[in-house]
Amino acid sequence: EMCIRDSSKGETFRRIIEEKTAILDIGGGSIQISLFDKDTLVSTQNLRLGVLRLQELLNHLNAGSTQMERLVDELATAQLDDYKKLYLKDREIKNIIIVDDYLSPWAVRKAHERGEVNAVVDRKAFSQLMEALRTKGTTELAKRMDIAEEKVPLVYISAILTRRIAELMGAELVWAPGVTLCDGIAYEYAEQ
């Protein structure tokens, strides 16, 4: 695992968590949402919405790609509504920092192609990605995103989750540092 040691990323991280921010860590079995307000950790919550868990469920339901989006949305919304009531309340979250093995590599690569250091994705770029994932074939997507074909559905599920959470929180920006935050990095920053 790699921590944010790169000072430029560390700077961006600190600047971003000064505002109301959520760190979204998407794993295979669950997702973890950590809320920051003025760079203080407010809450950390695990939801059973992992990408591999959802993929297994979709396979079990024999879901085609057309139903996939609706089903992931429904499954996520059910858990996220409770989450919102309990933890978000009326907080407006400005930014989401996403940590995963699915979307982040794509966002980082896109940023490098544009010659930018930080992989910040706004709503427009995100909509374009969703549209591509919705309409293009797996083989073409794998080529374009430079990933293995079996990873494409996982990227799609991750994107649907991220979009749902961004909508729920009213977030404007998604930042993918392209590193795994080490456990405790949040606390490290909060304690400084």
Task: Report the location of each language-model feature.
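Active-site-adjacent helix-turn-beta-strand microarchitecture at beta-sheet edges
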Residues: I26-S30
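Short glycine-aspartate micro-motif
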Residues: T21-D25
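Helical "lid/coupling" subdomains associated with nucleotide-phosphate turnover
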Residues: E1, R5-K20, L35-K38, S43-Q192
